[in-house]
Amino acid sequence: MADTGLRRVVPSDLYPLVLRFLRDSQLSEVASKFAKATGATQQDANASSLLDIYSFWLNRSTKAPKVKLQSNGPVTKKAKKETSSSDSSEDSSEDEDKKAQGLPTQKAAAQVKRASVPQHAGKAAAKASESSSSEESSEEEEEDKKKKPVQQKAAKPQAKAVRPPAKKAESSESDSDSDSDSSSEEETPQTQKPKAAVAAKAQTKAEAKPGTPAKAQPKVANGKAAASSSSSSSSDDSEEEKKAAAPPKKTVPKKQVVAKAPVKVAAAPTQKSSSSEDSSSEEEEGQRQPMKKKAGPYSSVPPPSVPLPKKSPGTQAPKKAAAQTQPADSSDDSSDDSDSSSEEEKKPPAKTVVSKTPAKAAPVKKKAESSSDSSDSDSSEDEAPAKPVSTTKSPKPAVTPKPSAAKAVTTPKQPAGSNQKPQSRKADSSSSEEESSSSEEEEASKKSATTPKAKVTAKAAPAKQAPQAAGDSSSDSDSSSSEEEEKTPKPPAKKKAAGGAVSTPAPGKKAEAKSSSSSSSSSSEDSSEEEKKKKPKATTPKIQASKANGTPASLNGKAAKESEEEEEEEETEEKKKAAGTKPGSGKKRKQNETADEATTPQAKKVKLETPNTFPKRKKGERRASSPFRRVREEEIEVDSRVADNSFDAKRGAAGDWGERANQVLKFTKGKSFRHEKTKKKRGSYRGGSISVQVNSVKFDSE
């Protein structure tokens, strides 16, 4: 697939694939909007579908980290062109890249300077790291690609806004695109069509555990495979969720740390080279700068901004509650606009929770935003939002988690395109409602399945949490997906809490996916957040009950990935059982315990008797009194030449220069020995004749 590849692939090459995917997914409304927005036409029915490409890529990606063509790392442009050889796979991967760089690219378009400078700087690093992270990056790109289908479904107007920047970014960031794209393409060329599709899954895997992509891939692969089986959107969501699930895990332990850690994390991901291509090129640029910032100032523009995030983390974390909105507004009007808009929307549903969570997200966002590297800020912000989300999750305030999720979404998007934020905000006002409504309606059905998966992902993510901490910041898509995941797990909880409301949370999920997919979809974020927060209010009681059931529901979702309906039914049943079955199970447990207690006394007696007998025997044994000897002298044969290690036993000792010293020192031990030896060295010691004779023992090599 890489053999045809000198044709430049553009995002529009993927439009037919996405359009077909939408139609196959029975998203006719979204498909029609997408077709109108992009002017895409139906693809040849015989051509590979996104799912085919994705499945092929998934199967190949797990087997072929080999695609990390380090030799081609520098030649990412060629690799990119090579990947263009397969329009479907490469287009999808590159579309992902460009859509993924719909986040970065828009950043690049808005930040052409940063794109050209950091990304070129990131090129070398990205190429080097891309060779190691090319798979992850390609996977990530494909995830982005699949997120884009979701986004394009939900945020088609935004997609329009995003794609022009993406194209511009392509021209301006052709280098960075080629780097990031080529890294994915390097991998994709070999398994381009399937890889394109599989990339999303593999990306999720790799991204889920950037530090340990291989491990993350299998786990995520399973979750993703299930997700994809339920529905491509659900697979996208599940991928995002899995990625995000890992980020939330990171975030759970660290809320405020996120602000401080974001830059470090961004740097760490870069170092790990687990960053996705977008993140690898941009984030590596930015993150390397953070890394260098740690070591020293970085020449590229982003670094100075990264220090700001470092400074802000401590202050902003404290300020989260009080100055959250204000800092966000003051620091980045555009990004804060989207933040504030999303926050305002969030506030109506859950004013108290939202104000706190948004503030946290905003400071983090601010910090990240202050850094010129949107990728760095994206990753750090994503991590920070994810952490607040995770934190809220642990308390299990239904409303709070959702606002945090929404905020997380808003934050990532804002970071994703700090420059794009104005655009995204415009898109928000114009198309956020439409996108969110349509995407919510369509996604409601798919996300019903995705929700359980998302929860499953969240659960699986905890194990991945540490690796992914780097992974989140490592890639924008990771961070965005993590944010999406954060949101997703919460909507899933809502779904589980309210089976009827499943469709509603699902829209939230899709909105989340959209928003995370493209920075321009912040409007969809806002709308989705609003919806989410409104839903939280209604579903809060149910959510709380479902949280108890949330685990079973997610487990069921894992088992029930077969069909969304089954998942929904299981969720509903579990919800019902949450209040009833769990208490019942507790009673059963108590009964079982009582039964155990009845039988235990006998067992205990038996056990007690046995131990009492053995200790007596052991005490009676002589071994207890004798000290333990690993080596018994009587059983070991020692060579006569080394049996005696004293000075006198050495050959040539008699009449030697050190003989007189030995006469004094052989009776001396401890500190006094060193003292005496030093006196001999410093004083006027004169022993016997100094001999050059070799008295060492030579052992035969037997």
From Swiss-Prot:
Residues 85-566 are annotated as: 11 X 12 AA approximate repeats of an acidic serine cluster. Residues 123-135, 151-164, 189-205, 224-235, 245-278, 308-329, 353-362, 447-480, 514-525 have a biased composition (Low complexity). It holds the Pfam family SRP40_C. This is Nucleolar and coiled-body phosphoprotein 1. The modification Phosphothreonine is found at T594, T610, T613. Residues 10-42 form the LisH domain. The modification Phosphoserine is found at S88, S89, S92, S93, S371, S372, S375, S563, S585, S625, S646, S689, S701. Interacts with RNA polymerase I 194 kDa subunit (RPA194) and with casein kinase-II. Interacts with DKC1/NAP57, NOP58 and fibrillarin. Residues 215-390 are annotated as: Interaction with RPA194. Residues 65-635 are annotated as: Disordered. Residues 172-188, 330-342, 431-443, 563-572 have a biased composition (Acidic residues). There is a cross-link at residues 68, 77, 195, 201, 351, 356, 396, 402, 407, 413, 421, 447, 459, 582, 607, 616, 650, 666, 698 (Glycyl lysine isopeptide (Lys-Gly) (interchain with G-Cter in SUMO2)). The gene is Nolc1. The modification Diphosphoserine is found at S89, S92. It comes from the Eukaryota. It comes from Mus musculus. Undergoes rapid and massive phosphorylation/dephosphorylation cycles on CK2 and PKC sites. NOLC1 is one of the mostly phosphorylated proteins in the cell. GO terms for cellular component: Cajal body; cytoplasm; fibrillar center; nucleolus; nucleoplasm; small nuclear ribonucleoprotein complex. Nucleolar protein that acts as a regulator of RNA polymerase I by connecting RNA polymerase I with enzymes responsible for ribosomal processing and modification. Required for neural crest specification: following monoubiquitination by the BCR(KBTBD8) complex, associates with TCOF1 and acts as a platform to connect RNA polymerase I with enzymes responsible for ribosomal processing and modification, leading to remodel the translational program of differentiating cells in favor of neural crest specification. One of its GO terms (molecular function) is protein heterodimerization activity. InterPro entries: LisH, Nopp140-like, Srp40_C. Keywords: Acetylation, Cytoplasm, Isopeptide bond, Methylation, Nucleus, Phosphoprotein, Repeat, Ubl conjugation. Transmembrane segments: none annotated. The modification N6-acetyllysine is found at K33, K421, K666. Acidic serine cluster repeats lie at residues 85-96, 130-141, 176-187, 232-241, 273-284, 334-345, 372-383, 431-442, 474-484, 521-531, 555-566.
